[in-house]
Amino acid sequence: NKFKNIFSFSSELKKYNFDKIFIYYPSPRIFIACKLAGIKDIYHYPLFKKKNLHLINAAQKFTASVLNIEKCQTYTKIHINENKLKSVSTYFDKSKFNIVIGAGSSGPTTKWGTDNYSNLINELNKLNKFNFFILCGPNEKLIAQEIMDKVEGDNITDLSNKNISEVIPFIASADMYVGNDSFGSHISSQSGKPSL
């Protein structure tokens, strides 16, 4: 029930005692829930104008208007603690091109496959100019191990035993990300590194 959702969302919002909220969607229900939650300053898209809504242009225009600035950039840049970046620097050979391989994925239909990744790594290893880091979730260690078993050379590091906050500096420090999971691609992009 749509009305029940308004009240449950309003109750959830009340818990946080927000003074101000920014709604990046033309939703009357979210607006009403915010009003019911007692939020004083509610900034929102024009209501009932969902048709032909261009998400990027609308967000840019809205943000520029609310912040009273002329132009709002559409890209983000992630900021990573310098100590975390330094802590992973010993894993990188700066004389080589360092690639994070994102072999894990949330669904089986989006996986490129261990054979494809190991073949790619073996082909690139013929040039002797690369280091590789295998990024998989903790429940995908077998994928990382299977790739590593098929790769000739010792220029590969398994990241599957690391948590998210530990792998982010690896992705940000690498020269490139190649993978099927969007997490690595997002971090790579926000770090100004190419991804494929």
Language model features: what each stretch is:
Residues 1-196:
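Catalytic machinery of carbohydrate-active enzymes
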